[in-house]
Amino acid sequence: MAPNPRKSHPLLKMINNSLIDLPAPSNISAWWNFGSLLALCLMTQILTGLLLAMHYTADTTLAFSSVAHTCRDVQYGWLIRNMHANGASFFFICIYLHIGRGFYYGSYLHKETWNTGVLLLLTLMATAFVGYVLPWGQMSFWGATVITNMFSAIPYIGQTIVEWAWGGFSVDNPTLTRFFALHFLLPFMIAGLTLIHLTFLHESGSNNPLGIVSNCDKIPFHPYYSLKDALGLALLLLPLTTMALFSPNLLGDPENFTPANPLVTPPHIKPEWYFLFAYAILRSIPNKLGGVLALAASVLVLFLSPLLHKSKQRTMAFRPLSQLLFWTLVANLLILTWIGSQPVEHPFIIIGQLASTTYFIILLILFPITSALENKMLNF
């Protein structure tokens, strides 16, 4: 019998083992769809971004006009730009749901996969931040100024780092040029990290909603999960295209319709919605260095998840107290997101401080205590 090239060809064999004949648990739910949706988001962003880069000019005098030109004069330029801008929002929706699923079902116990995933999140956040600066609108400029200026809180070397990052003494042409270069480079870094992420995942195999070893009950990825993923892709593209076509500016900031002006500060500087929870944590601490450390901790705390797992059970499927805590954490993050979009005044200040404190207390103290309590309850 002639050898099947799908199983014998060096390149096709790798693809086959990763996407076709991959043994997958038979009971993984729709929450396991988000990995492939993130891959789709990345491909969409790279493709639309490449097309936008062909028409963009990374110069402070021309950046804003070049974006307007893309939307007005380039064939379907408006659609490409809207897909790219809203694609970022959907990217973050997918990654937050993906992390939430990993947290709920104890997927973080695959330590290497989890740690590369957190690195992917950090790289994605960096990419989105530098990308937001490129249209050179008011919020782009002031967002860049405020966020990069935070590095000056680092003792001794902070100010030097900021001036080095800016390429001068303020956010100006050199800053825009290097941000464009970084925004072009980072997605390919994300793609590389994704391959590492998948390599680690396929080393151990997927987790499942029950959190038990599923080696005795596997099914091939294709056709079962390839079809399930195709449905997920359709369900993701539907709201994305709807938003890009009907309300492309829904999640944007109106300030960005005004070209950047260093002499006029917007009344309320805030980042895109997907950074608001971290921004609220940053603002809730009145000290600059303390705020920066809390901001970093809000994301880096994810690295501690495997160390803080004290339960005898992997998932939260049969742990009602941990479930209650998990959904409290979700509500807490929504409150932080809302607070981040509000001005710094009473009662938002105190709500933000309470929500920030609660965020860290739930993650670092209450989850391990609750897990230990549930372990005790198993004995009764």
Swiss-Prot record:
Question: What UniProt keywords are attached to this protein's entry?
Answer: Electron transport, Heme, Iron, Membrane, Metal-binding, Mitochondrion, Mitochondrion inner membrane, Respiratory chain, Transmembrane, Transmembrane helix, Transport, Ubiquinone
Give the way it sits in the membrane: Multi-pass membrane protein
In terms of InterPro entries, this protein maps to: Cyt_b/b6_C, Cyt_b/b6_C_sf, Cyt_b/b6_N, Cytb/b6-like_sf, Cytochrome_b, Cytochrome_b_C_euk/bac, Cytochrome_b_N_euk/bac, Di-haem_cyt_TM
Q: Which GO annotations describe the biological process of this protein?
A: mitochondrial electron transport, ubiquinol to cytochrome c
- Cofactor: record remark: Binds 2 heme b groups non-covalently.
Q: Where in the cell is it found?
A: Mitochondrion inner membrane
- The residue ranges crossing the membrane are 34-54, 78-99, 114-134, 179-199, 227-247, 289-309, 321-341, 348-368
Residues that hold heme b b562 according to the record: H84, H183
Q: Where does heme b b566 bind?
A: H98, H197
* Pfam families found in the cross-reference section: Cytochrom_B_C, Cytochrome_B
Task: Please tell me where this protein is predominantly located.
Answer: mitochondrion
KW Acyltransferase (keyword) present: no
May I have one GO cellular component term?
Answer: mitochondrial inner membrane
Recorded superkingdom = Eukaryota
* Molecular-function annotations in GO: metal ion binding; ubiquinol-cytochrome-c reductase activity
* Obligatory cofactor(s): heme b
Report further notes. Heme 1 (or BL or b562) is low-potential and absorbs at about 562 nm, and heme 2 (or BH or b566) is high-potential and absorbs at about 566 nm.
How the protein assembles, per its UniProt entry? Answer: The cytochrome bc1 complex contains 11 subunits: 3 respiratory subunits (MT-CYB, CYC1 and UQCRFS1), 2 core proteins (UQCRC1 and UQCRC2) and 6 low-molecular weight proteins (UQCRH/QCR6, UQCRB/QCR7, UQCRQ/QCR8, UQCR10/QCR9, UQCR11/QCR10 and a cleavage product of UQCRFS1). This cytochrome bc1 complex then forms a dimer.
Give the family from UniProt. Answer: Belongs to the cytochrome b family.
Q: Please report the name of this protein according to its UniProt entry.
A: Cytochrome b
What high-level taxonomic lineage is stated for the organism?
Eukaryota, Metazoa, Chordata, Craniata, Vertebrata
